């Protein structure tokens, strides 16, 4: 492994985190799979509402996280501002039937980068949860990495 050619990748919330970290750690390449951003908007207010119910966590499609995460996230600039400053190769993938991350979000991320590669996967939803969608993601990701090594 060449430690100078590491690719940072994240899906959904992980895509938001990867996009936010890339300007700081400057990976060789960045792969964003249906990168989330919508969760940032109003995150502290949502946390307040959940805390008022007596819970200190949220369950988002089986991913449980503490409301402390939302409060910490609220301290940061919006996702698109925070993603600025990374100028390496970027791959943005989204399923055409994703109901959590819309095409506009991917387009806003794309505007941050110099020359992103954007593609849409047929079906599979937010988690690319069909064999065909998963295979397409793996194929496009592998091709992107090979092209940028």
Give the location of each predicted region.
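Alpha/beta-hydrolase fold nucleophile elbow
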Residues: 1-11
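The alpha/beta-hydrolase serine catalytic core
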Residues: 25-108, 114-120, 125, 131-138, ...
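Short, hydrophobic alpha-helical segments
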Residues: 145-149
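Aromatic pocket-lining residues of Rossmann-like dinucleotide-binding sites
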Residues: 21-22
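Hydrophobic aliphatic residue packing
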Residues: 1, 17-18, 31, 101
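Gly/Ala-rich beta-loop-alpha elbow adjacent to hydrolase catalytic centers
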Residues: 10-14, 18
């Amino acid at each position: 492994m060449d430690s100078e050619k590491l690719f940072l990748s994240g899906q959904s919330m992980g895509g938001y985190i990867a996009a936010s970290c890339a300007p700081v750690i400057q990976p060789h390449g960045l792969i964003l799979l249906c990168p989330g951003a919508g969760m940032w908007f109003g995150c502290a207010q949502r946390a307040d509402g959940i805390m008022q119910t007596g819970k200190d966590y949220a369950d988002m499609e089986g991913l449980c996280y503490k409301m402390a995460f939302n409060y910490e996230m609220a301290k940061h600039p919006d996702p698109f501002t925070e993603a600025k400053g990374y100028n390496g190769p970027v791959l943005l993938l989204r399923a055409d039937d994703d109901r959590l991350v819309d095409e506009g979000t991917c387009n806003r991320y794309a505007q941050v980068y110099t020359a992103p590669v954007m593609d849409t996967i047929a079906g599979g939803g937010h988690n690319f949860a069909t064999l065909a969608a998963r295979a397409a993601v793996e194929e496009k990701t592998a091709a992107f990495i090979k092209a940028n090594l």
